[in-house]
Amino acid sequence: VGNILMSDDAGVKMYGLPPMTLDMCVAYSQGEIGYMIERNLRNILREHGLTRHVVSMISQVVVDEHDPVLQNPTKRVGRIYTREEADKLAAEHGWIFKEEIKVEGGWRRVVPSPAPIDFKNAALVERMARSGSIVITGGGGGIPVYVDGEGMLQPLEGVIDKDLASAMIGARVKADELYILTDVPYIYKDFRKPTQEVLEFLDYADAMKYLEAGTFGEGSMAPKIRACLSFVEKGGQKAVITEATKLEDRRYGSKITMHYD
């Protein structure tokens, strides 16, 4: 989405194109992500002589228009601006900017990241998946929308955490297992410290204790663990966090369940 926002910004500046709203940028990214995954997946299935229906589905994820986080946006998106540019854009569009710590004198737009509470087309996704189709959905966390007083869907300027969205979608379609792929094969206690320890199995209670103690990085592993807990809390049997290249190797991956077996 950040790249799309920067391309959009260039189009506005160079050619006078109308700016895209953030929900449209998320939808744009979903189309790209879905296309890339679907095309490659179809090719892989063909290489293995397998015939399966593959479908990419736009996902509108419902959020609460009164979510408190909407009053305190923290998710940085788009390019870095000067203070003068940021002030001008804030006046023109009502955007909120925060100073960029890593770049002196730089400012970036910040948007809220509301919690996902529902997923449109959940019943359809479940039906297609149970019939044997491979469904690609939830790209970029989904397009945030809210339900207005008349029951109509309205866009909301924000981005949804992709792991929380995946957990919610998984629970809504009654999936048994959730897999979150990252760049490490396990959850670690004291990550990259001399006392580093692999946590191969976690139940809900122990995972919550670690989160409350601040054991995991808020910008990395903690949100993924919260997503896993949300999934098993809503009926999922097991959530796994592992490295993408280790997905097929059962020796790797941290497993999270409601209770230890």
Task: For each feature predicted by the language model, list its residue ranges.
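C-terminal catalytic "cap/lid" subdomain
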Residues: 1-261
